[in-house]
């Protein structure tokens, strides 16, 4: 944990400084966490809902934060778990979470900005269609540029498992792009 993170954690645990420290935490990590969540749930509205739940969990759980990993990694873990929980709630009891890929791919097309070119939309759809664990590994490595060790701390998964998931995700994305190229 860095000195800055230690300072934020200390102030988050102090009732009179909590609000200001939380604002600083969001200023430092909010955008990264939002886009991490957004790539998992796709929809802006869903990402906002997940971020609210994440904020609540961070504030309620800060007392139990032990500093064994960086504050950012700890926040990522909470955001990841909340995003996956959100996806599970969207599923019916009998539909596996990985079956959401098709509907997420459709959301990508609907959420795409007008200036997004076809290649960008295809790429985002390819990622949305990945199985959950591959998508998670891909997003963390490709977009968030996290190391496998950081990813392991966030997900609780073995580094080799994450490397395998990332490798297969890259292969699936390439295959999707080749099959759907103009």
List the predicted regions and their residue ranges.
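Amphipathic, Lys/Arg- and hydrophobic-enriched alpha-helical face
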Residues: 26-44, 61, 127, 172, ...
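Arg/Lys-rich amphipathic alpha helix in sigma70-family domain 2
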Residues: 64-66, 77-97, 116, 168
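Structural recognition of an alpha-helix C-terminal capping motif at a helix-to-coil junction
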Residues: 35, 49-56, 69-81
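N-terminal module of bacterial RNA polymerase sigma factors
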Residues: 1-32, 150, 182
């Amino acid at each position: 944990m860095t000195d800055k993170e230690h300072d934020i954690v200390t102030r988050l645990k102090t009732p009179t400084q909590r609000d200001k420290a939380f604002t600083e935490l969001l200023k430092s990590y909010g955008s990264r966490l939002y886009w991490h969540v957004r790539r998992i749930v796709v929809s802006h509205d869903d990402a906002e809902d997940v971020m609210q739940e994440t904020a609540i969990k961070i504030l309620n759980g800060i007392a139990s934060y032990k500093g064994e990993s960086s504050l950012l990694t700890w926040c990522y873990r909470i955001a990841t778990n909340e995003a996956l929980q959100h996806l599970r709630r969207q599923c019916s009891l009998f539909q596996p979470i990985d079956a959401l890929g098709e509907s997420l791919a459709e959301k990508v097309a609907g959420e795409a900005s007008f200036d997004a070119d076809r290649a960008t939309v295809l790429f985002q759809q390819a990622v949305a269609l990945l199985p959950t664990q591959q998508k998670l590994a891909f997003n963390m490595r490709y977009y968030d540029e996290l190391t496998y060790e950081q990813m392991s701390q966030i997900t609780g998964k073995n580094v080799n498992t994450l490397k395998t998931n990332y490798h297969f995700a890259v292969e699936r994305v390439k295959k999707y792009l080749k099959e759907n190229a103009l």
